[in-house]
């Protein structure tokens, strides 16, 4: 099996090395953090001045490393003072009080630390407290469409796009030949591991049945504006009593695993964020489809929106949902530089009513920021309709907002 280099992420790691900072790779389990860490290990192993200290907490040979004392002892037993020591630890959140180790060795000369973790609360909140925020977080996403084509040696065509939309971008699918039955079984195993290890065990969840129902509800309502209160009411109607506070806590726990992402609403006129009624998207559209039935009629727009959201994040945008009086803009995308774009997602612009709705919402925004409609309308690759750019989904995933 060909070893595919995820160069953009390795470049980000390289740029952060040598700056007396801890590099933290974060993201959902099985998204490729371990793969990247091994690639970094293999690249640095070619350097005679480098000494690699590698710990993978998912491998049985490292079971004895349970807390920071064990980790310190392992590192001390493998350090070479005359070389640059690269301390690489995979799934570090499974080591009790790991923060003490990374804080201590960060200050050692000739030492670089790169760690991975699946739980954002463990990494972001506790590291900030214990090491004063002196770390670089690199968020690793599921495969992009371009990476998907490379991993699976596929041509760029509509059939490959359909596979990407349906099966998603977990790197582990490379081993399965994209057989849908095998893929769904693998995705369910990944999800079960995340729910058990990163949600139920870590948060002492006492109602796993509701947790399962909740994530299925979020899959079925991908891209819809929902609230904790509306979920609570829906669950009560299904015979399951749950408070809005409990819903909020369960969703927070899910977001901390990176399986789902909460997207706030943004008041375009008032230029402020709303404090309630958000949208949720899945890190991997394949896992979303595993839960929500990606081949069902009516699901395609939900999945498309999920795919577009993730690619906008991949392009470096902070993404919110736009509220414009009574109408909605699917995505308001901004960067720290002040750049902003508006994006509407539609499956097919098949008639004038659809065109009026999708383009009309964007025309109601009276500013000069770029505006896009992304669709799968046949024969459309890129067109300009009175200043609103209509992009084909495949072109967007290949080339970005062009």
For every predicted segment, state its role.
Residues 180-339:
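Accessory nucleic acid-recognition modules appended to NTPase machines
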Residues 121-137, 152-153:
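Short regulatory helix/loop adjacent to the ATP-binding pocket of P-loop NTPases
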Residues 33:
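Conserved lysine of the Walker
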Residues 25:
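Hydrophobic anchor at the beta1->P-loop junction of P-loop NTPases
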Residues 112-118, 139:
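Structural recognition of the conserved hydrophobic beta-strand(s) that form the central parallel beta-sheet
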Residues 36, 40:
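Hydrophobic positions on the alpha1 helix immediately C-terminal to the Walker A/P-loop
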């Amino acid at each position: 099996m060909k070893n595919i280099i995820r160069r953009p992420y390795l470049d980000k790691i390289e740029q952060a090395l040598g700056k007396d900072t801890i590099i933290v790779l974060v993201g959902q389990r099985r998204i490729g953090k371990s793969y990247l860490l091994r690639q970094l290990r293999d690249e640095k192993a070619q350097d005679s001045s480098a000494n690699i200290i590698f710990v993978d907490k998912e491998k049985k040979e490292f079971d004895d490393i349970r807390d920071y004392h064990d980790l310190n002892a392992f590192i001390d037993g493998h350090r070479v003072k005359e070389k640059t020591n690269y301390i690489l630890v995979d799934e570090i959140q499974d080591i009790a009080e790991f923060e003490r180790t990374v804080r201590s060795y960060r200050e050692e000369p000739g030492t670089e630390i790169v760690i991975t973790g699946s739980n954002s609360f463990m990494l972001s909140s506790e590291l900030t407290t214990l090491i004063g925020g002196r770390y670089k977080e690199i968020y690793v996403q599921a495969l992009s469409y371009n990476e998907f084509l490379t991993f699976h040696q596929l041509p760029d065509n509509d059939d490959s796009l359909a596979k990407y939309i349906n099966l998603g971008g977990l790197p582990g699918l490379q081993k399965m030949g994209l057989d849908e039955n095998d893929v769904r079984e693998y995705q369910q195993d990944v999800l079960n591991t995340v729910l058990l290890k990163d949600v139920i065990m870590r948060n002492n969840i006492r109602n796993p049945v509701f947790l399962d129902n909740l994530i299925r509800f979020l899959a079925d309502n991908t891209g819809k504006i929902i609230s904790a209160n509306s979920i609570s009411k829906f669950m009560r109607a299904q015979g399951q009593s749950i408070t809005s506070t409990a819903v909020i806590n369960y969703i927070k726990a899910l977001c901390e695993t990176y399986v789902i992402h909460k997207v706030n609403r943004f008041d375009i006129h008032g230029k402020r964020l709303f404090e309630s009624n958000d949208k949720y998207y899945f890190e991997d559209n394949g896992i979303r489809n595993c839960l929500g039935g990606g081949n069902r009629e009516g699901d395609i727009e939900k999945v498309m929106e999920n795919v577009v959201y993730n690619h906008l994040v991949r392009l470096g945008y902070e993404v919110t949902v736009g509220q414009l009086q009574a109408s909605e803009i699917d995505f308001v995308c901004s960067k720290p530089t002040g750049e902003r774009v508006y994006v509407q997602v539609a499956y097919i612009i098949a008639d004038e009513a659809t065109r009026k709705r999708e383009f009309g919402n964007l025309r109601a925004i009276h500013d000069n920021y770029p505006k896009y409609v992304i669709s799968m309308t046949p024969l459309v690759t890129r067109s300009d309709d009175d200043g609103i750019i209509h992009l084909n989904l495949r072109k967007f995933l290949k080339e970005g907002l062009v």
